[in-house]
Amino acid sequence: MQIFVKTLTGKTITLEVESSDTIDNVKAKIQDKEGIPPDQQRLIFAGKQLEDGRTLADYNIQKESTLHLVLRLRGGTMIKVKTLTGKEIEIDIEPTDTIDRIKERVEEKEGIPPVQQRLIYAGKQLADDKTAKDYNIEGGSVLHLVLALRGGY
């Protein structure tokens, strides 16, 4: 099937894909056509950033759907969020992202609503309206995720 990828410059790229293709595969096809390395690509569909390991079918992307390609700035940063079970979730952030935005990214990957998340870094609970930069969260930083019990603050 054919899908379209629209860049910020307004250019539209046509790609031949299968619904079983992963987002990684799609990024590789964009690299073949446009020469943009996959690690600099962010693909958006229906307002959501698409995760590399998922397939087009997972996002209900059908023939003639249009994805939006946003280039990742060099300032983009990869952090880890560690859950109580010891699982580490990798999240791509910008220094200007709010803690609330980081919680939304955790929700996209893990399905945990932001209201149930408490993020801890350097022994401090992080406030939703502050940014990663406010807490000096940088590439490679590890945040700890604690689940808030209902009614608990």
Curated annotation (Swiss-Prot):
The keyword Repeat applies. GO terms for molecular function: mRNA binding; protein tag activity; ubiquitin protein ligase binding. Signal peptide: none annotated. CDD domains: Ubl_NEDD8 (cd01806), Ubl_ubiquitin (cd01803). One of its GO terms (biological process) is modification-dependent protein catabolic process. The keyword Repeat applies. There is a cross-link at residues 48, 63 (Glycyl lysine isopeptide (Lys-Gly) (interchain with G-Cter in ubiquitin)). Keywords: Cytoplasm, Isopeptide bond, Nucleus, Repeat, Ubl conjugation, Ubl conjugation pathway. GO terms for cellular component: cytoplasm; nucleus. Pfam families: ubiquitin. Residues 1-76, 77-152 form the Ubiquitin-like domain. SUPFAM superfamilies: Ubiquitin-like. There is a cross-link at residues 76, 152 (Glycyl lysine isopeptide (Gly-Lys) (interchain with K-? in acceptor proteins)). Residues 153 form a propeptide. Ubiquitin is generally synthesized as a polyubiquitin precursor with tandem head to tail repeats. Often, there is one to three additional amino acids after the last repeat, removed in the mature protein. Alternatively, ubiquitin extension protein is synthesized as a single copy of ubiquitin fused to a ribosomal protein (either L40 or S27A) or to an ubiquitin-related protein (either RUB1 or RUB2). Following translation, extension protein is cleaved from ubiquitin. Belongs to the ubiquitin family. This is Ubiquitin-NEDD8-like protein RUB1.
